[in-house]
């Protein structure tokens, strides 16, 4: 494209911008005229003052502020955004004027005002011209608190009724209620508190940073000391650290053994032995109560004589069962007292009773066996192995009488030496 075409386009853009600015200014003048009319209605009693205020700096300040809001890049998209901002600002300004109408209707005669706040809108035209970015500056509100104590006398109260209505007028012709002033004061106080809190937070941060730096310095110093100690240990030869001998500690004594269980000895029941009257009386006199005792006197030993029977069973045609009947019926043992007892009861008798002569059943075990042809039987040996007893060979002819228990059993009380038996009486000495 040629350079001339670019210039033409730039001129057209500039003209469009100027036309937009003119239209915006026309809108602003119309709004200002409406505001002036509203101010004239409010202050109908003081027309001259209201006209001066309307033509004065109040409206011009608003126009300049609106112009500053719109000052900058006048693009088509940003225009509507800035127009909305301006519309909201004007809307809030109109609400303030409506509240001021209610204040002017107060007809109280005695009104004392302790605080009079004037809101002035300052234009920062110099700052806007010097701004390079072209950003719009929001209107700055300066709250001036002027404490003016008006003391009215009773005589002058009637003359100053008209002036009380106009006491709330500001320099710009706008009216602000007392509630709004209180709210603004609270806002200012809150802002001051926020500033103080920010300062305290900053102070706390600075203290924490200092503590952190101190901790870092201590940490680095400790690291240096550790490194120096490690280097010294590596340079020196390693020495075996001998630990001192630990003192000998005796082991604790073992726990005492538990007490033994006490068992009561069971009483030994001794059955009484059936003995002769003379021996039983002597034994009973020697026994103590509850203690079993067993004692034998020499008289008991010498009074007993042990003998061995010499009965032999002959090898004959007749059996003992034919001659004398069954041997089981005739097995009778005579005691020294002359009482007959069976051999089965004799087994259960004590040692003293067992010293008597044996029965035919015991002697039958020692009998010799003979052949059927009548050959001689082998001799019987003495059980006691005594030297005084001779071995004799018995033949069937030597037996004159049949083998009966009466002939075989001898009484121990007989002291005759002319007995048919060749055996001598057995005593304890011979048994040994």
Swiss-Prot record:
Residues 311-324, 383-414 have a biased composition (Polar residues). It comes from the Eukaryota. Residues 37-53, 122-147, 154-168, 274-288, 352-378 have a biased composition (Low complexity). GO terms for cellular component: cytoplasm. Residues 1-23, 37-56, 122-168, 270-290, 310-432 are annotated as: Disordered. Residues 181-226 form a coiled coil. Keywords: Coiled coil. Residues 1-18 have a biased composition (Basic residues). The keyword Lipid metabolism does not apply. This is Putative uncharacterized protein DDB_G0285869.
